[in-house]
Amino acid sequence: MFSIQQPLLVFSDLDGTLLDSHSYDWQPAAPWLSRLREANVPVILCSSKTSAEMLYLQKTLGLQGLPLIAENGAVIQLAEQWQDIDGFPRIISGISHGEISQVLNTLREKEHFKFTTFDDVDDATIAEWTGLSRSQAALTQLHEASVTLIWRDSDERMAQFTARLNELGLQFMQGARFWHVLDASAGKDQAANWIIATYQQLSGKRPTTLGLGDGPNDAPLLEVMDYAVIVKGLNREGVHLHDEDPTRVWRTQREGPEGWREGLDHFFSAR
């Protein structure tokens, strides 16, 4: 098995995992965050959120300066000490937010798909949808390489929409609350592998990895982890991995940050 004393990276989703889906509370996870920080174990946030949102949350959680994965892997925010790496401070995968928006506007105009993007509304509306403050809601609109939307059409039309996006080199991904469109080449798994390889190159040893997530869009991330915690979530589809060996994967009984704490307790408390 493994311990927090060895080279280790922890990758964590946010909403529904480290943060409560409704209140955004993270206090149940605070003791473990402190313990990992004291052991110099990087906790790498990985989410559909924008880098602007996540940098704010990093500071709140005491994780500032560490790398993070934003917009479902389309954006990698580099660690503060990685200034010599090409692309610092952020690496963008695939086409830009503006280019994706143009594609979506064309599809909506010509093929009459029904959806509302975050670009279609103001921060007050997003605050109503999410329960965030207006200042935090404004950060959700600062996309760099994806578009977030609410789907307002039928399941049949969604299948057609997804197929059209795939033809255009894009993917349609379900999050905890919203849907996301990003380049087909981007993903949480590719971003995580890049970060793991960078730590390995800098230290000379591949770190052991632990990932935590609660939704279907976390599955690619958890697949490439050495160990995985599937936090009990609200999504009816859940998370299904190809390798669910119980020595590698733990499914929690609790939701959100309490489940996050439960997962860390399972893998580390007895060690």
Curated annotation (Swiss-Prot):
CDD domains: HAD_Pase. GO terms for cellular component: cytosol. Its main location: cytoplasm. It catalyses: 2-O-(alpha-D-mannosyl)-3-phosphoglycerate + H2O = (2R)-2-O-(alpha-D-mannosyl)-glycerate + phosphate. Its cofactor is Mg(2+). Its EC number is 3.1.3.70. Mg(2+) binds at residues 13, 15, 214. The active site is at 13 (nucleophile). GO terms for biological process: mannosylglycerate biosynthetic process. GO terms for molecular function: magnesium ion binding; mannosyl-3-phosphoglycerate phosphatase activity. InterPro entries: HAD-like_sf (IPR036412), HAD-SF-IIB-MPGP (IPR006381), HAD-SF_hydro_IIB (IPR006379), HAD_sf (IPR023214), MPG_Pase (IPR012815). HAMAP family: MPGP_rel. Belongs to the HAD-like hydrolase superfamily. MPGP family. NCBIfam families: HAD-SF-IIB (TIGR01484), HAD-SF-IIB-MPGP (TIGR01486), MPGP_rel (TIGR02463), PRK03669.1 (NF002976). This is Mannosyl-3-phosphoglycerate phosphatase. It comes from Escherichia coli O139:H28 (strain E24377A / ETEC).
